[in-house]
Design a protein with these regions (language model features):
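Sec-dependent bacterial lipoprotein signal peptides
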Residues: 1-12
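Low-complexity, acidic/polar, glycine-enriched regions of mature
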Residues: 14-217
């Protein structure tokens, strides 16, 4: 898991932070904010990651989903757009060793029961609702974007925890607060009370807790 201490190692010229967790409502997708690819900054895959946590009666599982691609269009501290791609086959399970159930859980999560990674190998998040003139990055408290999981795209609003900038080389780090999405909104049905009755205690919570750290190169 990428430590949020890594963020504080940057020299801050703009910053803001807060704590808390929020349940995120999903709405219909909207047009993504246009970016200038030539002026966009590559996300540092080795220093960026999404943390996930799932819940069931009497327990939980957690892990990471590494970033496989992504760019942020930031010019002179102004954000114009961006996107992040995550490959599901890179998903990790951190609270179980591979030989004690970690590999089995990963295989199940990637199967047709859950995310059907063979058919839908990537998760995509693309920023929306940014005006043509952009927004000052240091002033942001949330990010709006289209989250595509399987064959469903929904717009969500993610609360931010901190934004850190290095004035010397325009390196940026953006971290979110912990937030939850409802997997039923993306038709992830296995063990869900939203789709099945009579599960008793053999259900898995619809809410998935997420948080992320994105750093640019």
């Amino acid at each position: 898991m990428v430590s949020f201490l890594a963020v504080s190692s940057l020299i801050a010229s703009c910053s803001g932070s807060s704590n808390g967790q929020k349940s995120i409502a999903a709405s219909d997708s909207v047009t993504a904010s246009a970016i200038d690819s030539a002026k966009s900054i590559q996300i540092d895959f080795s220093a960026s990651s999404v943390q996930w946590k799932g819940f069931k009666p009497g327990g939980s599982h957690e892990g990471t989903l590494p970033v496989s691609d992504g760019k942020l269009d930031i010019r002179d501290g102004v954000l114009h757009g961006g996107y992040v791609l995550l490959r599901l086959d890179s998903l990790t399970v951190e609270n179980l060793s591979p030989e004690k159930g970690g590999n089995k859980l990963k295989e199940h999560l990637l199967s047709e029961d859950f995310f059907d990674a063979a058919k839908w190998p990537e998760v995509r998040f693309e920023l929306t609702n940014i005006p043509a003139e952009g927004v000052v990055l240091k002033d942001l408290t949330e990010l709006k974007g289209n989250l595509t999981l399987k064959d469903v795209t929904k717009n969500i609003t993610i609360p931010l925890a901190s934004i850190v900038c290095d004035p010397k080389d325009a390196t940026y780090a953006v971290s979110s607060k912990a937030f939850t999405i409802n997997r039923a909104d993306w038709n992830v049905k296995y063990g869900s009370k939203s789709f099945f009755t009579g599960l008793g205690d053999n259900f898995i919570n619809d809410e998935i807790e997420l948080s992320f750290l994105l750093r640019t190169k």
